[in-house]
Amino acid sequence: MGSSGGPLYIGFDLSTQQLKGLVVSSDLKVVHIAKFDFDSDSKGFNISKGVLTNEDEGEVFAPVAMWLQALDAVLQDLKHQGLDFSLVRGISGAGQQHGSVYWNESAEEILGGLDGGKTLEDQLQQALSYPYSPNWQDSSTQRECDEFDAFLGSEEELARVTGSKAHHILRFQRKHPDAYRKTSRISLVSSFLASIFLGSVAPFDISDVCGMNLWDMPMNRWNERLLKLCAGEAGPEELKKKLGDVPHDGGQELGKISSYFAKRYSFHPDCAITPSTGDNPATILALPLRPLDAMVSLGTSTTFLMSTPQYKPDPSTHFFNHPTTPGLYMFMLCYKNGGLAREQVRDAINATSGEKTDPSNPWSNFDRVLLETPPGGQKAGSGPMKMGLFFPRPEIVPNLGEGEWHFNYTPGQANEELKETDEGWTHPRDDARAIVESQFLSLRLRSKELVHSPSGGVPPQPRRIYLVGGGSRNAAIAKVAGEVLGGIEGVYKLDVGENACALGAAYKAVWALERAPDQTFEDLIGRRWREDEFVEKIADGFQPDIFEKYRQAVQGFEKMEKQVLMEAKQ
């Protein structure tokens, strides 16, 4: 990485556990990266894994002041690296989805009048009506989610109208009525980021707004009925003022950078601020993702993303407007129990293994056991498959409380059997393959209506599987991804996979400011994107016999989920 004399663009990624700032040049070369890890780098916040928790009510939230501290630190780090801020032409960002920030009536004045001699943390806390932001792992809103479902008649109808299902504003105005009354504007985490750089409360992004359950996707406007439910006594017009208008162009210039940053860091006064999007929409912008390509983000959560022209909402999935391209949608599956659940199994294997754990690779025992276990955990070709659900936190898909379930499944029309049992299981050894398979089987089950055959005689599946996030470094997990999900062209890793959100945000800024009239993101970025530099094939994809075995496993997995759900309701 080195300096560049041409225009530069910054993409920020404000995720659950860290803030990253990534700088690219016009030709998409990464020239600087800075990051701030909340657990190890923040001072004065009693957090764990980036959040505070109230276990009694299932609340998970983050102190907004910590994010301000992180932004101060990341900008200072970029300065120390030698970034010439005067060359930065545009800024965009990515924010963890479903989190909200509450501004008070002094916010505009404070944002617009920051003192260049002081930090953001010292000045902006006074602009908030509530000091915390709910996190996507929060499970305190089940009552509110159920009300949203019932309000439009069913969860299927809510999914059809809004692209997904459920939100925190309804709970916030009930639990903190005084803070809600003092709230003049509400931001998502993404628009909060943009607001700081803009020096004014920024509008929502056309894609990220779809995660609020208030945006009518077929009509592309606020849904008046859902606003009424969410607004409480103050009424829908008051809530609409707090939410603001939403520009439909994901590349629109919102304005120039706040004078605070020009004074403190020597940004050029003409540096443009563009809409910041959600972390998941930003991830699909980290490469020109084509329809039928799938991206799997293996981070704290497990997330499956596809770009598709088809709008086929379902209560267990999320659809969003594409962050840059009208006429395309982003399909998303998001699971709370991703990396944290895999880590629990890893730790159990390390604790019981006779092998010494390599401190430089704590996954070595897990990977070895995973690869030694045959697909489906079948000891013999005709033996039962081992299946499980591993939820250390309450899960969204399926909607279940925390717990762990183990099943044996024998496929076949004549002798099919599904049985909840630990018979034949060796814990935690068998859990390694079972947990990885369970996460990928759920993805295959829920994406099957959106994939089709990539070539004659080949069963429906993605064309390519791209892995991003921390788990993308794990070759054993990548191998199982290809076995379960297919991918006729194989499984690939983005070589900056852990920086995918920040990279997508930076690309979005490049496109917003350098596009020709009507030029799409896919066209501009596709012309500059060098696949051989950014992508590495790390595993085989479609293998006919194993893919067929997992087709049978999907049937058992679906039945297992239904049985556990039915028992949970009793």
From Swiss-Prot:
Cellular localization per UniProt: Cytoplasm
Biological process terms in GO annotation: D-xylose metabolic process; xylulose metabolic process
EC numbers on record: 2.7.1.17
Gene3D superfamilies named in the record: 3.30.420.40
Top-level EC class: transferase
Listed GO MF terms: ATP binding; D-xylulokinase activity
Residues holding ATP: 363, 470-471, 474
Protein name as annotated: Probable D-xylulose kinase A
The organism's taxonomic lineage, starting at the top: Eukaryota, Fungi, Dikarya, Ascomycota, Pezizomycotina
